[in-house]
């Protein structure tokens, strides 16, 4: 599957299906078929790491901002903060093993930026060819990265919006804040 076909197919799916759970069920197999083709569209620039934090490289953003696809480069020891997405998403691993550590709201739904009690959930290890997905319920809260003992990772991340911001959670203080993400190349 080419990246052009992937973009066309997931755009059609999102026009046809409104429910985020239905969208990820339909899009996850497309991501699985796209992963082996990544060498044909991932350039040297898309593989460029950042020594300070994971590097996010934009592959496509829909003109209406409804969808975005990024290649993310992770060096050993690089992690996201605990965060949510405000969207559905599908993630596939091209190289390496990506680790996802999930969190759950102890009180159910989060309604404000303070008084949030999170507890750790499960851990998922995603190897080459693995695909995972998430839907807002009301949102998927996790941290993702690569432990110091593992090799670098290259992953593809598809979101149901232009992923230019997310909530970052301070687990110890029970707060969250909306953080703008840099629009990297």
Kindly label every feature range from the protein language model.
Residues 136-156:
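Ligand-binding loop in jelly-roll beta-barrel domains
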Residues 156, 163-185:
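Extended, aromatic/histidine-rich regions of cofactor-dependent oxidoreductases associated
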Residues 70-84, 136-139:
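Conserved short histidine dyad/triad with adjacent acidic residue
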Residues 90-92, 150-165:
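A short hydrophobic beta-strand segment most commonly corresponding to one strand
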Residues 1-39:
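N-terminal leader/capping segments at the start of a protein or of a new domain
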Residues 87-106:
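Glycine- and acidic-residue-biased ligand/ion/polar-headgroup-sensing regions
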Residues 50-76, 131:
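A short glycine-rich, His/Asp/Glu-containing loop-to-beta-strand
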Residues 105-141, 181-184:
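Short acidic-glycine-tyrosine-enriched beta hairpin
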């Amino acid at each position: 599957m080419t990246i052009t076909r992937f973009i066309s197919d997931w755009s059609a799916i999102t026009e046809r299906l409104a429910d985020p759970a239905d969208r990820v069920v339909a899009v996850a197999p497309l991501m699985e078929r796209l992963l082996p083709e990544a060498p044909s569209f991932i350039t040297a620039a898309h593989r460029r790491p950042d020594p300070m934090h994971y590097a996010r490289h934009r592959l496509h953003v829909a003109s209406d901002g409804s969808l975005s696809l990024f290649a993310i480069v992770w060096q050993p020891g690089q992690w996201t903060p605990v965060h949510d997405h405000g969207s559905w998403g599908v993630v596939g691993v091209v190289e390496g093993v990506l680790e996802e550590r999930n969190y759950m709201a102890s009180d159910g739904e989060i309604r404000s930026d303070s008084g949030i009690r999170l507890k750790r959930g499960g851990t998922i290890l995603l190897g080459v060819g693995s695909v995972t997905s998430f839907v807002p319920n009301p949102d998927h809260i996790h941290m993702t990265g690569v432990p110091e003992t593992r090799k670098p990772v290259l992953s593809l991340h598809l979101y149901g919006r232009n992923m230019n911001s997310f909530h970052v959670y301070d687990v110890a203080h029970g707060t969250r804040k909306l953080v703008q993400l840099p629009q990297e190349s």
